[in-house]
Amino acid sequence: MAAAAAGAGSGPWAAQEKQFPPALLSFFIYNPRFGPREGQEENKILFYHPNEVEKNEKIRNVGLCEAIVQFTRTFSPSKPAKSLHTQKNRQFFNEPEENFWMVMVVRNPIIEKQSKDGKPVIEYQEEELLDKVYSSVLRQCYSMYKLFNGTFLKAMEDGGVKLLKERLEKFFHRYLQTLHLQSCDLLDIFGGISFFPLDKMTYLKIQSFINRMEESLNIVKYTAFLYNDQLIWSGLEQDDMRILYKYLTTSLFPRHIEPELAGRDSPIRAEMPGNLQHYGRFLTGPLNLNDPDAKCRFPKIFVNTDDTYEELHLIVYKTELRPSSYTQSEASISASVHPTLDFCRRLDSIVGPQLTVLASDICEQFNINKRMSGSEKEPQFKFIYFNHMNLAEKSTVHMRKTPSVSLTSVHPDLMKILGDINSDFTRVDEDEEIIVKAMSDYWVVGKKSDRRELYVILNQKNANLIEVNEEVKKLCATQFNNIFFLD
Amino acid sequence: MHPGGGPSRAERLELGLGRERPAKAIFLHRRPGEGGGRERCLRCGHVCVRRGPGPREAVPSGRPRPDTLTPPWVRQRAVTGTFCASWTPLRNRRAQRMATDMQRKRSSECLDGTLTPSDGQSMERAESPTPGMAQGMEPGAGQEGAMFVHARSYEDLTESEDGAASGDSHKEGTRGPPPLPTDMRQISQDFSELSTQLTGVARDLQEEMLPGSSEDWLEPPGAVGRPATEPPREGTTEGDEEDATEAWRLHQKHVFVLSEAGKPVYSRYGSEEALSSTMGVMVALVSFLEADKNAIRSIHADGYKVVFVRRSPLVLVAVARTRQSAQELAQELLYIYYQILSLLTGAQLSHIFQQKQNYDLRRLLSGSERITDNLLQLMARDPSFLMGAARCLPLAAAVRDTVSASLQQARARSLVFSILLARNQLVALVRRKDQFLHPIDLHLLFNLISSSSSFREGEAWTPVCLPKFNAAGFFHAHISYLEPDTDLCLLLVSTDREDFFAVSDCRRRFQERLRKRGAHLALREALRTPYYSVAQVGIPDLRHFLYKSKSSGLFTSPEIEAPYTSEEEQERLLGLYQYLHSRAHNASRPLKTIYYTGPNENLLAWVTGAFELYMCYSPLGTKASAVSAIHKLMRWIRKEEDRLFILTPLTY
């Protein structure tokens, strides 16, 4: 029960019971076609983490996955296994490209108890991990790889197995360290995008700003506009935006927040040429535009890999309204040709000042929104909303996102109940509603309607079913008044 | 009052659930009486393997009766008593040992005070129960204690077993499969080769253990007992084969049983032979993970699950497209496992495989597939299994008391349980003092009876193991229908294989008493309406419900009516109950209340310490009406409880 396993049992009650959260045991990528004959099994393995594992052990583990997949094809040739549950761990399988398999093995959470004779007894908690959550995490691993490296097949075409292995090694070596498996939850399943609600006028202003910019900077292919980690406008395809959003909000932005908070008086903007005072700067690319030797290195990204397969450069430019505030707007721009320092200067001069103005407009909106929602007292409920059609997601359960953990304000068990309800919803297409009362007496409500899902956790332990229903109705009326939910 | 109240587990009464169980193939069902033309072999279409006269002949009257009562190879042992010294005492002392077991059972029962339902059910019983209601107070709670060992459904099925399983896997480490090939493909290849070889050279256990007598054994014809249904890999043209394979794949639920050596024991669809390589892979997966001191549980894919249950020396696998959780599927597999134990006893099963690891168990079980098939079918339709409880035939309390009393008086020295049932519903159950039946055992008995119509033909006397009671030995069950044209079936469970006549006499006395008191007419009348309609409750939107009293181990539910008239609809409704049940009883995140609104109906589940209630309403009903319906329904059940439940179970 005790929330998230204080660092492997150094807590006050470590004497009786230690808890260990789920952990990544191994992660590997293989292609069965690459080592079809006996004695060549090692060739199948394209990436294996942890790399220190002995060769035969790797081959054995890959062999098990192949066997599981092959075995399930007996029963459904086109839909082989997605996951394997064992007493100690769970393995998740994903075949993102034909014959390329990605496997993630996660150890079940453990409770270590002291038996009467003083020996530690290990108990695996087999029902704690939610399949859908970790399958989504695994799929995300591929999407993220693909965003920065393109498809496996492309690497094979460009430089054969050797190049593919290099790319996989380079990417996953670091990326796997950023997986925080103990704090994965429903939001990982949705992989949604938080949108910033905006009035029409401001929205149009932003759109025309983007149009003008794309016109004057013709190497710009796509633009996305975010404010405070929330998306306002995107020219990218939904799936590409979804993973880019994930990267920006959980990796790139947080990395830049911390240094800023630390050294507010950084000299970046000190010698601004001209009188256009603004606080824009590049999050990717040159740190200092006035340094002629500044390196213009932008990460490459790959979008539309299913058809046009575009290779682009990711430029992220950010401005802050006031240097001390958190409010910020970011434009993420994708360019087709490699941007030069000169281009960066032009972009800075065009985008910087305008973005600052826009940011102030948006900030006004932001404050209005805040006043409206803040006028009520602390609500008795928390909710998560997701719309499958536009990927819009909204959560009052999660307090903040950091690069490492997403903090939730509710008990992990309740989050798992949400996950259970979500997986029940997936099994049928029809609209459904489920209201449950947990052992802790919290009420949890799940509604699915027209490809939208809403989950509510109510903190009124003594409420009855009818009151809970009323409460949720009220919530729907205030937050989602234009969405029909099954009553 | 309740937990820890009584000095002993007063509530553990055995009950007779009338659940259909298929007749076990390997047992000879035959009337023991030798004279007066009664001597007839009640064959149920199973293969009866035995020594001496061919299976289809009548038994010569001079034949020692015990031979007819035990599975063939057991009988062998008794006949050739000197052959296997270690076994002989085992058989001879069976009765004694059973008595000791009961003794032991009794004392162990006392230790577990927590499950004890209160002895003092005399306390006031609330009209409309609340969640805080204590066990023993809820509607349907027995007045004088329960009849069953307490089963808390799923949890009960697993707890002790897991210990056993880990012990087994430990053993596996030392003497199990030889060094692991590095590649799984290799393993599965090896296994398919192995199984081909084995079918070639298979020698029966009996043959080996009883040299010289092997020519007396009839090789059980492979497919007797049930038609070979759609073998997946047979077919004349390729197209046919494709179709057949596709049809085979699409079955809702496959069940496979195999031995640790990968030998097929049972397959629900398709012949075991055709599937031997698939089964080889299954067992390879199991042992592969065990080599890592791990255990395979399940595989999940879009639209189906594969669930593994390991009960040494067997491996059971289900492939299901139903909505059931892996937990529930594992529970069903355990039922299959117990079903096999009930035919063989656990002791014999492990003995066989100790003697010969790659023994082909189908030799012993052939003919029993029908019982297993029937069990699987029953589990898909009958909520008794889900509830882990028995349903009673609705009967006026006075009539039931008369029946129970008559049953109680018709006792014999060796009787442990007397059970009267009608179409898988319990009418009355009398047990020996301090002996309790487990609902699983009762379900297995019900399945045995319902899977064979041959029991209607006279008195049957068959050995049966009640695995939850004691997996080491056989009881002997006397099974007979009271009157040929009714569904009333009497089941008398005895410890003594020799006691047929005494037990048969109990039946006669019971019937006499019933007639004398006129209860047989009332019973007959009651059998005309074996189910009640939900309309009697008087809640317009209510379509169906299940209510279980935890302390008595009994549940009640009305007939399933429109719109659930077709078989598919009925299974869908049960599927919804299963879904709610699995969420409510989730091992790590149990729930107290669930209200589910779907496109076709609304359902509510409410689980408390004392009872479980599942209701199904019209989709038009509101939550407010549902809440008020709960109270109305609970009051109705309280009012009707003496008709719907057995409140005063008796002991001899």
Swiss-Prot record, chain B:
Transmembrane helix is among the record's keywords? no
Q: Where does the record place the modification Phosphoserine?
A: 128, 153, 188
| UniProt keyword Phosphoprotein, yes or no | yes
The UniProt keywords, alphabetically, are: Guanine-nucleotide releasing factor, Phosphoprotein
Outline the segment boundaries, as ranges, of region: Disordered: 102-141, 158-185, 211-245
- Report the residues modified as Phosphothreonine: 158
Sorted alphabetically, the Gene Ontology BP terms of this entry are:
protein secretion; protein targeting to vacuole; vesicle-mediated transport
* GO molecular-function terms, A-Z: guanyl-nucleotide exchange factor activity
Instruction: Fetch the InterPro entries from UniProt.
Output: FUZ/MON1/HPS1_longin_1, FUZ/MON1/HPS1_longin_2, FUZ/MON1/HPS1_longin_3, Mon1
A single Gene Ontology CC annotation of this entry is: Mon1-Ccz1 complex
Function as written in the Swiss-Prot or TrEMBL entry: Plays an important role in membrane trafficking through the secretory apparatus. Not involved in endocytic trafficking to lysosomes. Acts in concert with CCZ1, as a guanine exchange factor (GEF) for RAB7, promotes the exchange of GDP to GTP, converting it from an inactive GDP-bound form into an active GTP-bound form.
Subunit notes for this chain? Interacts with CCZ1. Found in a complex with RMC1, CCZ1, MON1A and MON1B. The MON1A-CCZ1B complex interacts with RIMOC1. The MON1A-CCZ1B complex interacts with RAB7A and this interaction is enhanced in the presence of RIMOC1.
Give the UniProt family note: Belongs to the MON1/SAND family.
User: What name does the UniProt record give this protein?
Assistant: Vacuolar fusion protein MON1 homolog A
Please name the source species. Answer: Homo sapiens (Human)
